[in-house]
């Protein structure tokens, strides 16, 4: 079995790790960084950039630079309207009511775009390990529903990875934190505030068992939202002063986004920061500049409601676990957004204790995923992970009520059955409407699938017995079956959300992703060949100046002719012609240098007799070394 890598697929940044012996190692990317921005850019010539190269060109290419795509995963188009208004790229309605990103008329799903980041992580691991990687453990926010988990698994498949396990981010963090603390029984709370999502999980650790007691969260709360309050403040201030809304121009909006993120980070260590955006826009009267000072106090005032929003799920998770704050032994802060001082202060105030600073908030989730990969491959022994389903599961019954079969915070894997009946006389079929959520009425919860059980024999209402069974695997992915107990007729499906992809679509996207990888490889080879030609032209010109007087006219002419051909090929960017030009230049130089050395050899032979003659007078003598 090959290595199973662990990937933290984040809203803002992603990270990859692998077990090396008894330790999980975070793998640096090609740019030498331990985390990679979850950003994809489509540039001229069809090239796709991922990570830091994509982030660097975002300001000049805002409508084709995709960030925070995780916030669209597993959602319908209608559910993402607010998110779509906050990004500079175009989000349109696609097949199956899915949100798609429009790039020059080609519509990309969130899964396809996330797969590009996963491919980068896969390649990073392969370069480090020196072998092909095909298996991975991928993390998701604990509060992701079934559709979002399915979408993450699909992204992995498109990237060419077999997803061995979907693991919750706070659980992964706890695994990384507690692996070396097997002897101590303790209860921990993991507060995980990332770029786009928030989770809180309460776990019990002891003797290698990691048991999740409860989880809660908000999949629409993260660092992006803290950036947004700064963006809105800057835009509103500028609009008041200049009468221009910078949010309406994609390039200005992208500059605001970058400035807001930078200001937020600076305010974690400084009391005040200056935001300076020269030439942010222009009017008939000339260019306009934005210069504002933002204090930490003002930022905390702007983001106060967001901080309070995060504390509501914390209280709920603690209540669901049946614990009080005094029962919690350790509080762990995970996710880059927890570096904001106000967050740490609020969490410490709630729990009445200092938060642990023993983990790197950007890397701990990927490390935990790698450890889980080690557990699955047998490299890590004596570790048992017991996770829970974050949301209740049930079906719609008469009157539009949600009847729950599996309550939230039930340990997974799990299976539960319940018998239902028909609502009308001689009803020939039943529709099983599967939902996820905590509200009493079906309409207020998330639909994750529908299917029909047909062929029910005519009978009065309430007589047929329809057994509905929910089966949740260790990934938190749901399978539902319905059986008519009278006829034995059954129907079962692995839930494919209405916003999901078909197997055919996934296969097509997988092939497209492979083609993109080939295109990237070709683009890289092209760039390398052009660089080689450029370097050869420069070196040849330098050597001609330096060694020109030692070459014959014919040798010089041959090299200059080959060099002219190579220059022309380089200008036309014809790779075949460039290779031919390189071969010709090298061949011309080889002929010239061989002649030079041959000539030098003849001179050496003529000098040899003199050396022999002078050697006749050499005598051996003894000498004493003076120390």
Curated annotation (Swiss-Prot):
Database matches in PANTHER family: HEAT SHOCK PROTEIN 70KDA
Chain positions found as Phosphothreonine: 197
InterPro entries hit by this protein: ATPase_NBD (IPR043129), Chaperone_DnaK (IPR012725), Heat_shock_70_CS (IPR018181), HSP70_C_sf (IPR029048), HSP70_peptide-bd_sf (IPR029047), Hsp_70_fam (IPR013126)
Protein name: Chaperone protein DnaK
UniProt family annotation: Belongs to the heat shock protein 70 family.
Induction description: By stress conditions e.g. heat shock.
Alphabetically ordered keywords of this record: ATP-binding, Chaperone, Nucleotide-binding, Phosphoprotein, Stress response
Any one GO molecular function term: ATP-dependent protein folding chaperone
Annotated Low complexity bias: 596-615
Composition bias type Acidic residues, residue spans: 617-627
CDD domains, per database record: ASKHA_NBD_HSP70_DnaK-like
Organism whose genome encodes this protein: Flavobacterium johnsoniae (strain ATCC 17061 / DSM 2064 / JCM 8514 / BCRC 14874 / CCUG 350202 / NBRC 14942 / NCIMB 11054 / UW101) (Cytophaga johnsonae)
Transmembrane segments: none
Its job: Acts as a chaperone.
Recorded name of the encoding gene: dnaK
Region described as Disordered: 596-627
Gene3D superfamilies assigned to the protein according to its UniProt record, in alphabetical order: 1.20.1270.10, 3.30.420.40, Actin, Chain A, domain 4, Substrate Binding Domain Of DNAk, Chain A, domain 1
Pfam families assigned to the protein according to its UniProt record, in alphabetical order: HSP70 (PF00012)
NCBIfam families: PRK00290.1 (NF001413), PRK05183.1 (NF003520), prok_dnaK (TIGR02350)
